[in-house]
Amino acid sequence: MSGYDRALSIFSPDGHIFQVEYALEAVKRGTCAVGVKGKNCVVLGCERRSTLKLQDTRITPSKVSKIDSHVVLSFSGLNADSRILIEKARVEAQSHRLTLEDPVTVEYLTRYVAGVQQRYTQSGGVRPFGVSTLIAGFDPRDDEPKLYQTEPSGIYSSWSAQTIGRNSKTVREFLEKNYDRKEPPATVEECVKLTVRSLLEVVQTGAKNIEITVVKPDSDIVALSSEEINQYVTQIEQEKQEQQEQDKKKKSNH
């Protein structure tokens, strides 16, 4: 058994490539990331690891990276692995602009990132990337939001709302209950609020460990400040309390 465990390009007798499956386990241990498509925006939200007391917070890397002026990428899994993927994706986006004089489409970039991940499952002397990504943005001259996911195996898929990383099952169940594909969040505020609510299902420490980036058409990408995120968290907690009080009243009336 151990031989199949170690060798990357060998299938086990029952058809598994264990190293790729272990890479997925690394993703499940990574901090949670969520992507939600609104009517005219895409929001990426991430759980940030707590910084230590003496750590310089300015160079704590963001979990959301800009690949081009209209595409952002968030990840879950090994930070160092993600840096390589992000760098490769940026270079590809730049060379596409230079060669074709046109920005990449979001799907093209997703396919490229998934292709890099796939190559690292089939080569000797390398290991798979321990990273899943969420890639969000708008195509040039198009107002339709796009959200894709890639996995260590090289699979990529398109989503209305998706989550990766630890506790992603809990967050996905929340999104399945609260996200309506026929009527996605109509405003940026609604979309951000749903993203923050989904993250609060698993992030215990509130606003200080949440990161939110909003992508709108025409290369309009904004990272929300801690104060803005805090306002959303406070509002959500107030609504929760009001709901609990209403439920209590209903019970006591019965």
Curated annotation (Swiss-Prot):
The 26S proteasome consists of a 20S proteasome core and two 19S regulatory subunits. The 20S proteasome core is composed of 28 subunits that are arranged in four stacked rings, resulting in a barrel-shaped structure. The two end rings are each formed by seven alpha subunits, and the two central rings are each formed by seven beta subunits. The catalytic chamber with the active sites is on the inside of the barrel. Interacts with CIC1. Residues 235-254 are annotated as: Disordered. The keyword Nucleotide-binding does not apply. Its main location: cytoplasm. Residues 237-248 have a biased composition (Basic and acidic residues). GO terms for cellular component: mitochondrion; nuclear outer membrane-endoplasmic reticulum membrane network; nucleus; proteasome complex; proteasome core complex, alpha-subunit complex; proteasome storage granule. It comes from the Eukaryota. This is Proteasome subunit alpha type-4. GO terms for biological process: proteasomal ubiquitin-independent protein catabolic process; proteasome-mediated ubiquitin-dependent protein catabolic process. Keywords: Cytoplasm, Nucleus, Phosphoprotein, Proteasome.
